[in-house]
Every structure is written in C-alpha cells, then in structure tokens.
Amino acid sequence: MRHFCLVTAAILAFVTGPATASAAQVVRVTSLSALQAAIDKAGPGDEIRLADGSYSAGSAIAIKRSGTANAPITITAEHVGKAEIKGSAGFSFSSGASHVVLRGFKLRHGGSMSVPVGSTHNRLTRLDVQLTGGGNWVTLNGDDTEFDHNVMQNRTTQGVFLQVLGPAKDMAKRVKVHHNYFSNHKFTGSNGGESIRFGLSHHQKYSAGGVVEYNLFEKADGDSEAISVKSSDNVVRYNTIRDSRGFIVLRHGDRSVVEGNILLGRSGIRFHGNDHKIVNNYVHTTANRGIVFGSGNEADSGPDSKLHDRPDRVVVAYNTVVGTTDGIHGDGGDFKPKDCVLANNILQGTGKLVSMPGGSDVKYEGNIAWGGPAGMPSGGYKAVDPKLVQDGLYRLSSGSPAVDAGVGSYPYAGTDFDLQTRSGKYDVGADELLPGGARKALTKADVGPLAP
C-alpha cells in the first residue's frame, strides 16, 4: 500500500483561512488527514483533489460542508478510478451537507455509504464501488440526489447494491439514477439481493418522483428483482438488462411508468399495484416470461402491507415481446387483474403468447400474435407475421402489417424505444418505422466511470 504524508503548499495556504465563493479554488491533497482538513474548510465552488494512490481509512471521511446550486463543493480523485479508499470506513455525509459532488474514487472499504435525510442536491458520480462489508452498500435518503456513471459489482452476500429510501414516513424525492453499471451479483438466497431498490413496503403510498434510466445490468442474479420499485410515481426507462435473473418489478406502489427498456436473455417486467403504464419496451428472452401481471393476494394494499396488490387499471401497450416461452403471463392469486389493458403489442414466440388466469378483467385490442397460441379473445389481436428484421434487435420491416395498425388512444406511448416521436396512427409494437435513429442495447462503454 502506498502511504502519503506530505501536504502541498496549496493546502497549507488553504487552511489558514475560510474559503468563500469569491475565492473558490482547486486544492490538491496527498493524504486522508489533509483531505479531511480540506473538506472541513471547504466553501462553495471549491474543488478538492486527492492524489492517485491507495489510502486506508480507519474512520469515516466526514462531509459536513455545503456548496450552493451554482457553486457546489467537489471532492474528487485526481484521476477517475486512481484514488482507492480501503480500510474500515469511507465517505460519510452529515445531515444538512448539500450541493456536494463526490467523484471518481475507487471504494474498497468496509461498512457502507449513505446520503442522509436533510442532505439535498448531492451528486455521487464516476465511483467504482465494491465494498468489503455486507448489508446494503449505498443508501440515498436525501432529496434531489443524483447517482450517475458509477459501477457496482461483484458480491455474493445478501444486500442490495443501491437503495433509495427517505424519512420513516415519506420517500426521498426526485432521486435520479442513470448511466450506471450493475454487474455480477451472485447471492443465492431467495430474497434481498436486488441491484436497485426504490423504497420498502411501508413506502408504497408515498410519491417519490424518482427516475432510473440508461443503466446497464449484467448477471443481476442476486434476486428475482433487479430493479425493485416499492414506492409511487417513479419512471424506469431506457435501461438494458442482459443475461440476468432479475426483472424490472413494480412490487408496491402506484402510477409508475416502465418505458423503452431493452431486456435480453432471462429478464422481463412484472408489476403489482394501480395505474401503471408499461409502454414501448423490448423483451427478447428464450428462458422466461416476458411481461407478468403479478399475483394478487389483496385487492388494494394498505400502507404497511407486504402482500401482493393485484394490478388495477394498468396499461400494457406498444411493447415488442419475442422469443419467450410465455410471452405475457398472469400469475393468478385470489385477486385477478382488474380494468387493465393489453393493446398494440407484438407477441412472437413458440409458446403460448398470452396466458391470463380465469376471471381477469383485461381489455385486449390491436395486438399482433405470431408463432404460438394467442391466448386472447379473437377481437383483441391479429394472427399475422409482423415481418420483423434483426439488426441486433428485432424491428419492423417496410412491409410489416404492424405499420400504422395501432388502435385506440395511448398518447403516453408517443415515443418509441428508439426515442423517436410517433405521429399519426402509431405502429404496433415498441418500434415506429422511421428513418435513422436506430438504438442499440447499452454496453459497458456507454455506462460507468469512464463513459462519456
């Protein structure tokens, strides 16, 4: 391990007096003690850089100071991924520490990291997180936290990579999680190894307004839920899940949107609760169900219930589901889906394309089913070859019967999975036949600390 004991002239000059916004400066440090001293004196606009190397922390590196919206405090590695924090502890935000950017560190320490209630508008970016302790690695409790361009990988123990919580009787608001790489969670237990968990059961009725987008998940095998949403009013969009046991799951809560995700290999989408929109997703899997209407153990969940709430008024529209053993499936339970819609989806596979339990209240319209038994009322689909062509993903060809075949009004599906705007009569499925703009599944080059 490399040790540092020198403090540069810049830091010696810095600590002689308090920093102000007008005197914002870059301060380079070469030890953890100097880093802590610089953080303790930091003011709006200051940037503190820790030199490349490996450092062992015997106690938490406390962040108590705040920047401003226009002049955040930045605490960063000199070069992304080149300053490693080992030992028994890492960075610790104090309640009230706000407008702070934590950037570029390689975190290999014990314990965990959290942004507490009362700490707002903080950003954790370009971190390489592979902690040595158990439990949940990173917890975000503060409003308006941004967690982006990080990598979290390689664990075999129970506990989630990232969870978003908040106060005991509310959720953290407007948390944004984007362009991260989650990989290789191999916990073999039955529960408790999610990559992302957005709330707990008792948060289900609280509105979070969170966004989870442009993240890549590979070998997310720690739980059947890679992204587990247990709060209300969230958006999960434009993510790629590849070769993973974990699904996108709306486990609790209402009024969330799952849009434009690309799910490859073993993953899919499952939902419980009310008034969700599941639109413009692409599911290509040979080993699992594509989209699942979750089981209902109760008609509507109470605020602290851990049972499965039946789906009510959920719209599943303009998705493409290909190559699945069971395309769209209803789990059953005592309480069946009620007032739900399955519209304008392309379903292609060799197994039963739709399999819903008796007593389900679902409106079917405009779907295209090909290759296996449709499993829908005859008026709810057309049994025609959608004439998909593959360029890495299956898309419409110019002669597809899906072109301009959408029925009904679903304006919230107006952006296809290529992020192109639909107009006129929409094309059935996740892809609108338009020139240019073909989107690819995310790769490691698109996410994580070294991505653009």
Regions found by a protein language model. Name each.
Residues 386-408:
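Short catalytic/signature loops enriched in Gly
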Residues 53-56, 79-81, 372, 406-410, ...:
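Acidic glycine-/aspartate-rich tracts in secreted/extracellular proteins
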Residues 58-66, 78, 83-94, 108-123, ...:
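Glycine- and acidic/polar-rich repeat regions and solenoidal domains
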Residues 12, 20-37, 52-54, 78-79, ...:
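Right-handed parallel beta-helix/beta-solenoid
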